[in-house]
């Protein structure tokens, strides 16, 4: 019987990051049914987007893999919300689907500290000393001090094509049949969630001349600062549904397993199927769809926004009702997948089970949707699992300093009754935790945790010294009686416009130039946000002794009930109670100010 510090079950985006992070300082095994499926992108061939790119930049800052994989295999990059402020600007990178998985497998299989074990997990058994045995379906037993379960959509997975279903974790791959049982046996409340994927269409059957072309940004961007050589090679395109599309869907809703009642699982609110869009937004006469290549030389394109569980024969008619797709040939049909998830409020903020100490969960098993959310959780769970195995101090990531902290807080303290998607609107301090400064915020933590080496830390420190030098250069020069930073603060001026006036900057990378521009243009807003955050930090020490929580009308019912039951002594303790949300903490602070009860607990 072999043993490791950490065993990771699953090789998707969560499992990959968990193994990579844990292997920085522990012995790791990854249990997968088929090593050739590691790192696959089963849905859209892209990384990033609003709320998601911020997570990827943070994973990168903490020594993770996703940003590196995305940059290495990029074929199209765009900054979304570029006309808006830096708090919501988000990078989206289109990837070569097969190359992404191949690169992930190359890295994982080539790591000397990671053993890849082929098999299906059937059971989890405690060893009586704080560790675990992972038992496979063929009877093998593997020992680990900590286990990360990153099973994706595979736990009792069922795929649906119309009213026809079959046991699969995703198309063509068997489900994890037994892994739900030990979790349920321990008392975990399991729920059924559902997600879906669009059809893939033969590229040579599409009339691209009839589509709106969306070029890549002329200056490719990346998560690592080093986008791959093909990062601007391919455009994407846009089409839309038609009245005929909507008519076909409305007349055939009985063929949908969701609307026929066959699927009990809840689907993602922010990534609805095309059936849901037509039904829920019946007042819209069209829905925009994005046509994305699976690679530069691929024979397939992906219909972003057209996920469906309708029967294949109907999918043919639906796709051919779209402009540019009149002669389309579907190579892979859309489908829905239903699967088990745990109740994330039964986890700690390190994603460790409260019911099974030493068992960590990450990714879609925790009720999230998206590659980026999975990768972020994988990094946390893998790091925490390794630190537990080696009896090191627990990992702590703050909501106030990262999207990652918001994700953990939301999952564990709030929970979700539907697949959770990270969005910029969930983040209270988004002007402080931007995608452009993730390395500045988190590199030091990465070094402390053993995830980032000191050479990387020195490079980040040097980067921000150059940024500071750039800002000082603007402040020290004058043209027409005004300093460069004053010119740059004008809404109509970009950094290039300031340089055109004659201001000289030191040599800076594109990322450093962006950092200079953001810090100058938004200095007042950023300083105000930092003062607000500092005030909130001080407020966490305020005493709640004697507060009548039941009389505070602005609290949510759940928060009022839990605060009355737990009776926390400080605002910080109240913030740590599951079900007490950020809005409830704000309501408590308003109440304390109104009543004059602002003493600190000492």
Curated annotation (Swiss-Prot):
List of residues binding FAD:
10-15
Question: Which cofactor(s) does the record list?
Answer: FAD
Q: Where does NAD(+) bind?
A: 267-281
Annotated region (Disordered), positions in chain: 217-242
Give the record's GO biological process terms.
tRNA methylation; tRNA wobble uridine modification
Question: Any idea what job this protein has?
Answer: NAD-binding protein involved in the addition of a carboxymethylaminomethyl (cmnm) group at the wobble position (U34) of certain tRNAs, forming tRNA-cmnm(5)s(2)U34.
Q: What name does the UniProt record give this protein?
A: tRNA uridine 5-carboxymethylaminomethyl modification enzyme MnmG
- UniProt lists the gene as mnmG
